[in-house]
Amino acid sequence: MTIGIVSYGAYVPRYRIKIEEIARLWGDDAEALKNGLMVYEKSVPDIDEDAATIAVEAARNAMIRSGVDPSRIGAVYTGSESHPYAVKPTSTIVAQAIGATPQMTAADFEFACKAGTAAVQACMGLVGSGMVDLGLAIGADVSQGAPSDALEYTAAAGGVACLIGRNESELAAIIEDTYSFTTDTPDFWRREGMPYPEHGGRFTGEPGYFKHVTNGAKGLLEKLGAKPEDYDYAVFHQPNGKFPSKAAKMLGFTKAQITPGLVVPKIGNTYSGSCLMGIAATLDQAKPGDRIFATAFGSGAGSDAFSITVTDRIEEIRNRAPTVSELIKDPVYIDYARYARHKGKIRLA
């Protein structure tokens, strides 16, 4: 059975803060940070935005792009590490907002930055089994980094929704296969009640990101009998600009393959939306017949790899909703004081 992406939608808040502004507060070297991270500014949610509102906006764009009846959606899964409620699903909010309720199932996913792609895989399973007609998978976050912590320079806000189906005439992209690589690696964590996550610093690199991304990618390539040169585009989880660039080189992918989907320099790390944002940006540009190789990463730790082929339908649906490039243009820049207010870093009680 053929399973794939019927539609997709993204959302990025319009507010931005530059690396220079954060560095100014903490006395850090902005140029060294920009060169090391390959990130120059990051998205900031508005005061009334959270992972749920971002997920709703992304889902609405996916529905506008698809043109399908929302009552056909049998499952809504939202992946995030910043769900607004500890007990109250984000996914029911999204489902109600897009008109998919009540004859459907919903659940929230957590797996650090790959919760969104885990939701995609779950939807693939439900759709493939015939249990549901369509499944909506979302990755959305308003990620947090403690003041002056390295994460504060990249932790951003944004989300992407993917409508998964099996009707070949509706598919804008076919998901040929997927492969996951998972271990218990404590590279990044946040306990209940902690306002900010903690991490292992450099430990998040080799034993975390690179081990899982490269093994996940190699596993799928071997499973398919494919090579990097078989693909027109490649997307890897984007905690910064340096890591996906290095991972691509390690695996044999070129700079030309990853550049179209490399959005992190302009918006930062959208966590659960990160890899999906790269896929969305690539779908915005890809032609029918193009192949996309994507690998998401989530701390804790694991990776999900996907092989995707774009269909003719992409040309029909692409411009029905804002593209990623349209969403990130014309930003509104704010200073650290306003950023702290937007991010809830100023606590009065």
From Swiss-Prot:
HAMAP family named in the record: HMG_CoA_synth_arch
Active-site feature positions: 81 (proton donor/acceptor), 113 (acyl-thioester intermediate), 237 (proton donor/acceptor)
Disulfide bond residue pairs: none
Similarity comment text for this entry: Belongs to the thiolase-like superfamily. Archaeal HMG-CoA synthase family.
One BP annotation, GO: isopentenyl diphosphate biosynthetic process, mevalonate pathway
Protein name: Hydroxymethylglutaryl-CoA synthase
Binding site for CoA: 202, 242
Catalyzed reactions per annotation: acetoacetyl-CoA + acetyl-CoA + H2O = (3S)-3-hydroxy-3-methylglutaryl-CoA + CoA + H(+)
EC id: 2.3.3.10
Function comment: Catalyzes the condensation of acetyl-CoA with acetoacetyl-CoA to form 3-hydroxy-3-methylglutaryl-CoA (HMG-CoA). Functions in the mevalonate (MVA) pathway leading to isopentenyl diphosphate (IPP), a key precursor for the biosynthesis of isoprenoid compounds that are building blocks of archaeal membrane lipids.
UniProt source species: Methanosarcina mazei (strain ATCC BAA-159 / DSM 3647 / Goe1 / Go1 / JCM 11833 / OCM 88) (Methanosarcina frisia)
Protein's pathway: Metabolic intermediate biosynthesis; (R)-mevalonate biosynthesis; (R)-mevalonate from acetyl-CoA: step 2/3
Keywords recorded for this protein, A-Z: Acyltransferase, Isoprene biosynthesis, Transferase
Keyword Acyltransferase included in the entry's annotation: yes
Domain of life of the native organism: Archaea
